């Protein structure tokens, strides 16, 4: 009908996928509204610094607008989170970022069905997670703290699901060893 406001639907996403990105600011706005919080949350957990996480979030969406990649429908979130993780890794490895402090009372630990989720002392757990190699730390944080499934993490990190499952399993074993007073190995 003429004069009625247009509602945003899944078909709108499909239509914008065929339009040039630089000419479709509504597409970028829709992606920002939908996924900025997820990008910020993942960045914050990785970096442990709200300001740096906000900078990464801004950088991700600026890259989206400038590069205008052709994204498959339904995979936009995976692309955004992958770019955010890569940017966080760059910052984390950078010489100016010497220390990573993960965790905050502002975000709750999502209980896991195994022993990791049963630990009473979250500070001890975060200290143990900080001792893990980066590849295990990433999947542990994304799965247990952010609640992403194995398939979502695999898509974000551009790795096979089996690799993610293996890293989760090995990461849990390493955490158990650390918490019992052993080395990371």
List where the protein language model places each region.
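N-terminal module of bacterial RNA polymerase sigma factors
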Residues: 1-38, 45, 121-122, 126-130, ...
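Internal acidic/polar
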Residues: 9-13, 98-127, 149
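DNA-recognition helix of helix-turn-helix
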Residues: 85, 157-181
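C-terminal flanking helix
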Residues: 36, 40, 61, 133, ...
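Structural recognition of an alpha-helix C-terminal capping motif at a helix-to-coil junction
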Residues: 55-62, 66, 74-86
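Residues within helix-turn-helix
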Residues: 51, 151, 162
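Arg/Lys-rich amphipathic alpha helix in sigma70-family domain 2
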Residues: 82-103, 118, 170
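A short pre-motif secondary-structure segment
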Residues: 139-143
């Amino acid at each position: 009908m003429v004069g009625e406001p247009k509602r945003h639907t899944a078909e709108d996403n499909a239509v914008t996928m065929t339009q040039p990105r630089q000419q479709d600011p509504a597409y970028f706005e829709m992606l920002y509204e939908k996924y900025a919080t997820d990008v910020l949350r993942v960045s914050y957990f990785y970096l442990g610094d709200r300001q740096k996480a906000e900078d990464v979030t801004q950088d991700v969406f600026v890259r989206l607008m400038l590069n205008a990649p052709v994204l498959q429908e339904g995979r936009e979130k995976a692309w955004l989170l992958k770019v955010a993780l890569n940017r966080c890794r760059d910052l984390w490895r950078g010489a100016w970022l010497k220390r990573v402090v993960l965790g905050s009372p502002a975000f709750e630990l999502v209980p896991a069905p195994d022993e990791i989720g049963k630990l009473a002392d979250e500070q001890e757990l975060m200290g143990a997670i900080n001792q893990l190699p980066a590849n295990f730390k990433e999947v542990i944080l994304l799965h247990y703290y952010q609640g992403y499934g194995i398939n979502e993490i695999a898509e974000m990190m551009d790795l096979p699901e089996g690799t993610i499952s293996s890293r989760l399993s090995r990461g849990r074993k390493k955490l158990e060893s650390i918490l019992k007073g052993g080395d990371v190995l």
